[in-house]
Swiss-Prot record:
PANTHER family membership: POLYPHENOL OXIDASE D, CHLOROPLASTIC (PTHR11474:SF112), TYROSINASE FAMILY MEMBER (PTHR11474)
Source species of the chain: Solanum lycopersicum
Annotated protein name in UniProt: Polyphenol oxidase D, chloroplastic
Alphabetic keyword roster: Chloroplast, Copper, Disulfide bond, Metal-binding, Oxidoreductase, Plastid, Thioether bond, Thylakoid, Transit peptide
Any matching Pfam family: PPO1_KFDV
Family that this chain belongs to: Belongs to the tyrosinase family.
């Protein structure tokens, strides 16, 4: 088939590294429209030795997870609010990245800086006659594994011979460090691409350029990344192709106990669940159904809330929360454990944002995260991309496979086929895994359970707590349900954000519920939080957030649509003794 487009021209800018030379970009069938001029900001300049003025220090975003819901100040802000598009980072303001309040990253995560950022052009997709097709890692053959290992080997060689080359492996990993650990600032605030609507588009663009780089180094423009198919039982183990010692796809800082065919826990938060492999897989499929269907009926719930200039939000979408976060934790090592090389673990490369990209499995994991975006839209209903102009016009900065710097917009990454790649179709058993088995034979006697007014405020969640709560209305029509989602909200959850937090939520059960069996209709979701990254001198370690769960579908499945009062049970899983909750409410909300 003849190409339907011509090769696009590129603008080469001088950069501080030795060029590998450039090759023509392959032809692609799909092109986007013209792009707008970048939003210009003025940021703080850091001196060349990496030190920075701390007088304008601001809070890091809390790395919060919440299975099935959104929380934080964003819930009080309508999606139509004016937010201004997020501009690409000003590389001249790039500074040291932080691990926590007492540790800084020992090396610079900043990307090589072009001579003139104002002249960095917008990226145009190269023409292509054949889509790159990403395949599940557990189906990878020896030829593919060998090819990918050669590519990563060449990337790592560049780390030694041309350490500032942007397509070297370390420089590629540093992209995640800079965007996620406080190296970049915009308008005086740290840029963070997690916990908001930037999560999916940033990582899609990130993988796009990494994939192009990998293909360039092995002279294969059709090379496509594998994806860790953790949403399917056959992919619910650590990918074997990354677990071969002596290859560059292996990383010894991973959790050694999760090798050799161990079934992954997609809700893992540091504590091993004592159960069978079959039950774990069932739990995983339930989590996937809850995250992709029940708790993500509309864009706001799936993508996370908008990022507003000057306001720190902690409102990630469903998939970013779980399984994205737990897969990182499950793969990384436990802090303080001894690694095979005798070193003491700091949670492993994959367990930290700043170092996650140093483990090649990062790109395999995020390839499946990216796939979930496409699968979610294919589920139907209101599951469509965000149309807010400030999201569509937000920008990032990357280097392409020819070492040329570019600006990219969110609006240009909404269709993977237009970007030149697609995913090999795989069965998605979670679509039909709606948990219908009930833990309770009928409706729990709510008169025997304390009402919400007596249960709250809750001083500490150190044990399972049940309460009854009134609904705003009952027996809603299908039209009413389609117009508004019924939301269970926990207001003003407070805890020390330097530790791990998790609690699960169930409907229509009492505090004797088996919280290790998630494949029950009554399981609504989980609230989780990772340790917060603080800057030196910060004294406020208390987080205060709201947490929402969509419960319309659950009420139907449990048979509580016509009930005016329902029972809710909270089960602490991690750090419950330090959790307090002001109140709980049920309301109807536009989704």
């Amino acid at each position: 088939m003849a190409s339907l487009c011509s090769n696009s021209s590129t603008t080469s800018l001088k950069t501080p590294f030795t060029s590998l030379g450039s090759t023509p970009k392959p032809c692609q069938l799909f092109l986007h429209g013209k792009r707008n001029k970048a939003f210009k900001v003025s940021c703080k300049v850091t001196n060349t030795n990496g030190n920075q003025d701390e007088t304008n220090s601001v809070d890091r975003r809390n790395v919060l997870l919440g299975l099935g819901g959104l929380y934080g100040v964003a819930n009080a802000i309508p999606l139509a609010a004016s937010a201004a598009p997020t501009p690409p980072p000003d590389l001249s303001s790039c500074s040291i990245a932080r691990i926590d309040e007492n540790q800084v990253v020992s090396y610079s995560c900043c990307a090589p800086k072009p001579d003139d950022m104002e002249k960095v052009p917008y990226y145009k997709f190269p023409s292509m006659t054949k889509l790159r097709v990403r395949q599940p890692a557990h189906e990878a053959d020896e030829e593919y594994i060998a090819k990918y290992n050669v590519s990563v080997t060449k990337m790592r060689d560049l780390d030694k011979t041309q350490p500032l080359n942007p397509i070297g492996f370390k420089q590629q990993a540093n992209i995640h460090c800079a965007y996620c650990n406080g190296a970049y600032r915009i308008g005086g605030k740290e840029l963070q691409v997690h916990n908001s609507w930037l999560f999916f588009p940033f990582h899609r663009w990130y993988l796009y350029f990494y994939e192009s780089n990998a293909g360039k180094l092995i002279d294969d423009p059709t090379f496509a990344l594998p994806y860790w198919n953790w949403d399917h039982p056959k992919g619910m183990r650590f990918p074997a192709m990354y677990d071969r010692e002596g290859t560059f796809l292996f990383d010894e800082t991973r959790d050694q106990s999760h090798r050799n065919g161990t079934v992954i826990d997609l809700g893992f938060f540091g504590n091993e669940v004592e159960t069978t492999q079959l039950q774990m897989m069932s739990n995983n499929l339930t989590l996937m159904y809850r995250q992709m269907v029940t708790n993500a009926p509309c864009p706001r719930m799936f993508f996370g809330d908008l990022m507003i200039s000057g306001i720190t939000l902690n409102s990630p979408g469903t998939i970013e929360n779980i399984p994205h976060g737990p897969v990182h934790i499950w793969s990384g090592t436990v802090r303080g454990s001894t690694l095979p090389n005798g070193a003491i673990s700091k949670r492993g490369e994959y367990g930290h944002f700043y170092s996650a990209g140093l483990d090649p499995v990062f790109f395999c994991h995020h390839s499946n995260v990216d796939r979930m975006w496409s699968e979610w839209k294919a589920t139907g209903g209101k599951r469509t991309d965000i149309t807010h102009k400030d999201w569509l016009n937000s920008e990032f900065f990357f280097y392409d496979e020819n070492e040329n710097p570019y600006r990219v917009k969110v609006r240009d990454c909404l269709d993977t086929k237009k970007m030149g790649y697609d995913y090999k179709p795989m069965r998605t058993p979670w679509r039909n895994f709606k948990p219908l088995t009930k833990a309770s034979a009928g409706k729990v006697n709510t008169s025997s359970i304390p009402p919400v007014s007596q249960a709250f405020p809750l001083a500490k969640l150190d044990k399972a707590v049940s309460f009854s709560i009134n609904r705003p209305t009952s027996s809603r029509t299908p039209q009413e349900k389609n117009a508004q989602e019924e939301m269970l909200t926990f207001n003003s959850i407070r805890y020390d954000n330097r530790g791990y937090i998790r609690f699960d939520v169930f409907l229509n059960v009492d505090n004797n519920v088996n919280a290790n069996e998630l494949d029950k209709a009554e399981f609504a979701g989980s609230y989780t939080s990772l340790p917060h990254v603080h800057r030196a001198g910060e004294t406020n370690h208390i987080a205060t957030v709201d947490f929402q769960l969509a419960i319309t579908e659950l009420l139907e499945d449990i048979g509580l649509e016509d009930e005016d009062t329902i029972a809710v049970t909270l089960v602490p899983k991690r750090g419950g003794e330090g959790i307090s909750i002001e109140n709980a409410t049920i309301s109807l909300a536009d989704c």
